[in-house]
Swiss-Prot record:
A cellular component annotation (GO) from this entry: sarcomere
Function, in words: Required for myofibril assembly and outgrowth of the cardiac chambers in the developing heart. Appears to be catalytically inactive, showing no activity against O-acetyl-ADP-ribose.
Positions of modified residues (Phosphoserine): 27
GO biological process: cardiac chamber ballooning; cardiac myofibril assembly; protein de-ADP-ribosylation
Keyword Transmembrane: no
Annotated compartments: Cytoplasm, Myofibril, Sarcomere
Species in which this protein is naturally found: Bos taurus
UniProt-recorded name of the protein: Inactive ADP-ribosyltransferase ARH2
Keyword annotations of the record: Cytoplasm, Phosphoprotein
Domain of life: Eukaryota
Amino acid sequence: MEKFQAAMLLGAVGDALGFGHAARESSSLGARVQEEMGKGGGLDHLVLSPETWPVSDNTIMHMSTAGALITDFWCLDDLYREMVRRYVDVLEKLPEQRADPATLEGCSQLKPDNYLLAWHTPFNEKGSGFGAATKAMCVGMRYWQPERLETLVEVSVECGRMTHNHPTGFLGSLCTALFASYAVQGKRLEQWGRDMLRTVPLAEEYCKKTIRHLAEYQEHWFYFEAKWQFYLEERKIIEDTENEASFPDRYDAEEREKTYRKWSSEGRGGRRGHDAPMIAYDALLGAKGSWTELCRRAMFHGGESGATGAIAGCLFGLLHGLDAVPAGLYRELEHQDELRRLGEALHRLSSQEK
């Protein structure tokens, strides 16, 4: 249970750190931010209070997904209706500066008062953003057992598609849900990317059964898979071997910025559903269990650091718990009591059949 609570807390911590860094954009490069952090005593002396280090909609939407997953729904359609209701409800109350425009646009298409079509939104050419990926880790926590894979695929795709109806967007939610389930299962980190890519065809099969106009999707499936294939080849973990991930000899903040931009589709790392989870995964591989190193790689860079931080923080919590994390980062964290409650409930319900 502690690791489930840690996952919810550290997802929010990663979001607050990354979002706060992006908001202080006078220091757009990770190197400069890390220098500033060093002058202030670093992460050990930092206290994340709601006034100075608020969370963004990444955390609010993740909490909304988790909140829906712990309700007493009868069937998955009822779960989706509950997600829609919560997404629309929270975004109406969220200050504009803390909401991602793509997520706001996606939510505007939802119809909470339409019983049959509540979560059915049209294909969206602009729906490829990171917002689907950052709200779905809890889906993998709820359905982490290998025998629940089919449910995980369906729920993560639908959860992502509600707001980001574009394969690059909702395959991001499949990706983060799968990674969370692998963390709980204790799967070797280097294996996650391969196993995720092998699961993408299940999502495609599900979409073929449930979407009338699949033609709009077809060309975009390849992009997500090709980007991940390229990444796994670059890190030399595409094959089923015991190899550790291979990093360049020089991989400091400046080099990482270049690499993250290369992986992106628009020159800003972590903006899309393929590269937000990719940067988080790369940071986990490179951090080797060090929270400080994870922050350097996932929370403090010149891209969408709130998104990559939220994903990386949550997965770190599932892998390692809170022991390596300075207490000041979560002691006064915004929504911390509710995050703990959600983690406890997800843990309890994940062993029950539904």
